[in-house]
Each structure stands twice: as C-alpha cells, then as structure tokens.
Regions:
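Acidic, glycine-rich flexible loop/linker segments
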Residues: 150-226
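Extracellular/luminal Protease-associated
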Residues: 87-115, 119-129
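Intrinsically disordered, low-complexity regions enriched in acidic/Ser/Thr/Pro/Gln residues
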Residues: 1-88, 209, 215-221
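Structural motif
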Residues: 28, 38-39, 57-60, 96-99, ...
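Ligand/cofactor pocket segment of small-molecule handling proteins
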Residues: 120, 124-152
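Short, ordered loop/turn segments at secondary-structure junctions
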Residues: 66, 103, 130-133, 150-151, ...
C-alpha cells in the first residue's frame, strides 16, 4: 500500500477508525477471508465491564506458579516478591496492553491498583489468561480488563512474573510484543502485524457495505437477493 493510499498515518488514527466504525465480529470475518482463521483467543475471555473494549499493542508478561518452602533457592528471583511484576507494570508504554499468561488458574493476575498504575502510564488495557479481582474498582476506573473470570485469591505467595516483553501463546495463538489486539464482549482478536493494513481496509469496506445491506433489507429485499446483490450477510 503506497503512502498516498494508506488508511491512517499513525496508531492514533488507526485507533480512531476502530473505535468509530469497527467491531470484533466484522474484523474476524475479514481475517477469515485472508486465511487468518485461528486468531481468536478462546471464548472464555470476557471484559470486566461489558461497556469497555480492548484495543492496543501487546506488552506480553510471562507468569509462573511458585510453591514456597523453607529450603534455600538457587534462583534469586524466587526471593523477590511477585518476581518482576512491578518492573513489568512500570515498563508499560502509552497505547500498550498488559498481556499475562503462563500461570495456573489458582489466583488473580490483575487488580485495581495495577489498573490505576497502568492507566496513569497511558496503557490501553489488560488481558490476563486467568482471573482478575477488585472488579468494582476496575469498573470505576473505566480501565479495560479482559480475563477468564473473577477470583480474589492473591498471587503473592503463589505466582511470580518471570519475564516480560517476550512472546507468548494463549490458546495456540502467538502474541509478540507490539502485536495489535482488538476485543469486545464477543471475543478478542490477535491481528498479525504484516496483515494489519489489509485487515483494516477490508473491515471498513465490509462494515460500510453492511449498512447498505441493512437498508435494503429494511426496505423489503430478501436475504437471498441481498446476498446475491452485495455478497455480504
């Protein structure tokens, strides 16, 4: 795509297009047509607040379970509370999404204070492959958080962050630092960097075409004729 035909100049313009015109279902549809048929995260991921959507670039965070004992450890990270969690949180950049995975579902990976810090740093949300807690506080902040459920149990003595800004896989979908994520209450998509421009272009064409289809159906056109005419349904 040449510079003159680009749909947006930067992330801010791209986010505006997503926020004003696009939704997950239509983006998923066009990704299917491009052969990107395995980019949805598992359907267990839901927003803490259904009014919020997830949109930004991934900052992956690797979690691991721990099982404390009285024996000496050979790993200095084991003596550090929460491992590298605070460093990972403080390293968030504007426009990024904190994406945590690797832990078993025994404790919460995200909460209100983490949301507060992330919001101050300009992050656009959190996606944790596990539980969130302090959900009323997260809702009050208006901070987008997607998780697999709610559980108040703390990770302090049960898990640690062992790395960040590293590639992850969630549900068989690879997420690298900087990968674009788009989510709403109907699902979360991982949009590969090399396909992003084409995905946005086709999604805009489809969503604008769907408005024409809806108008035709309201005016009496049958579903068969609508699909034959527009190729959209």
């Amino acid at each position: 795509m040449t510079r003159s035909t680009r749909l947006y100049a930067d992330d801010a313009e791209m986010y505006r297009l997503f926020e004003t015109e696009l939704f997950v279902a239509v983006v998923g549809d066009v990704m299917d047509t491009l052969g990107l048929r395995h980019q949805f995260l598992p359907p267990v991921f839901k927003p803490v607040d259904e009014k919020t959507r997830l949109l930004g670039r991934a900052m992956p965070v690797l979690e691991a379970d721990i099982f404390p004992s009285d024996e000496a450890t050979r790993n200095p990270l084991m003596t550090k509370p929460f491992g590298l969690m605070f460093e990972a949180l403080d390293d968030l950049k504007p426009g990024e999404i904190y994406v945590a995975s690797g832990a078993s579902p025994r404790y919460a990976l995200w909460g209100e204070l983490m949301s507060t810090r992330a919001k101050i740093l300009g992050a656009r949300g959190a996606l944790v492959d596990g539980f969130a807690r302090d959900t009323d506080g997260i809702k009050a902040l208006g901070f987008p958080c997607f998780c697999t459920g709610y559980y108040a149990r703390d990770q302090g003595v049960r898990g640690k962050v062992i790395d960040y800004r590293c590639a992850l896989e969630i549900g068989g979908v690879r997420i690298e630092p900087g990968t674009l994520l788009f989510g709403d209450k109907e699902g979360v998509l991982v949009i590969p960097r090399q396909a992003k421009q084409e995905v946005v272009r086709l999604a805009l064409e489809k969503v604008r075409g769907e408005k024409l289809v809806a108008k035709a159906i309201r005016e009496g056109m049958s579903a068969v004729d609508a699909y034959r005419t527009f190729g959209i349904m």
